[in-house]
Amino acid sequence: MSDNETRIYDIVVIGAGPVGENVADRTRAAGLSTVIVESELVGGECSYWACEPSKALLRPVLLYGEAARFPGVGGAVTGPLDAEAVLKHRDRMSADWNDRDQVDWLDSARIDLVRGHGRLDGPRRVTVHTPEGGIVRLAARHAVAVCTGTSAALPPLPGLDALRPWTSREATSAREVPDRLAILGAGVVAVEMATAWRGLGAQVTLIARESRLLGRVEAFAADLVADRLREAGVTLHLGTTIDTAERAGGPDDAVHISLADGTRLVADELLLATGRAPRTEDIGLETVGLTPGEWLGVDDSYAVTAVDGEWLYAVGDVNRRALLTHQGKYQARIAGAVIAARARGLTLDTGRWGAHAGTADLEAVPQVVFTDPEIAAVGLTTEDAARAGRVVDVVDYEIGRVAGAIQHDPGYRGHARVLIDPERRVIVGATFAGAGVAELLHSAAIAIAGEVPIDRLWHAVPSFPTISEVWLRLLETYRDQRV
């Protein structure tokens, strides 16, 4: 194609991860011609370097731990995990880093794909530099959606290039188990990768500036995870950070690390799990009056607030509302509906919980941390409520007292907490920590998003004996607290 030709579509989507795919799916289903631009693999970070490969590494580790602890089974669990088999399983779950199936889906959905690096080139215009060195010019009649996600944010360590650190990408795609792995960070990536690689046989040291892990979840849940990591043999250095780190080079190529508290460590690999940065540095933001490299602020319809005309949307991690794949897909469904409605000249339903408002970003964001034990949370934490000045009733229960939990593991360790708005008598936050609690989470999300009254929840009968009976115990505890 000539550089001077312009392909015109109703919608142009930059970024073909799960978020971009869902925006494109919604707009194409609404009858709008849609093109999606991708510089790497269709399917994005989640499919190849985050959600899918990380959970493929974690599931065998968590299953092994549960089996080893269970009466009558533990004796049959001998020897270490077969790391080679686990890594092959990870490869299969990541489609061997081949996006053929995802491209086939785009074709079946009649969504056009342009491979290359897409940059805004003024209002409603995108220029794509293709891998072959060509240029494709695109124009949108109605909207451009930026769905470029995030990349690893690295700390300013001296000699970073020579250090050759792991980011989350290397941690989920490594071809062999390192003998010694050091991890800098206290968040989800840090604790999940500590769990996975320790289970696969690495000696793991986790270093965190914070005084505790997982600062955004309830403290009781983070403490349970920290205890299990220590029991598994992970060394935790909390309340400190890396002063210097150097890769020695030579035959061993080890990383020599000095901590701020004076501790010295040696590792074969260093994972820097220190947060995320928006992938907006080189997407042409300056051509529409925005600053490259910044997060893109949006309203509840995901239109970028700093750009007039309601034609530019930022969906998923890039808007910083909730850095989670499933929440980005939720945003994509809303944004796609908004774009389609505006293209047809329809009035938007932007009220709270309306069809064109991302209310869940503010009130009901679910997240699972796949550690031992699992953490599943949605809505407010007690710290969130305190910061917002909201009065809530806090209800706690030890999950290990539930019959279903004892059936799951006679030594079950876990805890549940719900936060209740005493005036409205609805749940506004829930956190569960324990084996198998991820599957409790959607019931909590429904209770919060549906604003189900506490009195109605008594009619939602949990099956016996299941871990979900903790819901009944929480209601009983709340009843007794109010007497």
Predicted stretch roles:
Residues 4-17, 177-187:
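Beta1/beta-strand and adjacent pyrophosphate-binding region of the FAD-binding site
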Residues 14-40, 52, 56, 60, ...:
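Flexible, glycine-rich terminal cap/loop adjacent to redox cofactors
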Residues 15-18, 39-40, 184-187, 217, ...:
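Glycine-rich Rossmann-fold phosphate-binding loop(s) that bind the pyrophosphate
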Residues 76-77, 112-115, 119-132, 200-300, ...:
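A Rossmann-like FAD-binding core segment of flavoenzymes
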Residues 161-178, 265, 269-354:
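FAD-site-proximal beta/loop scaffold in flavoenzymes
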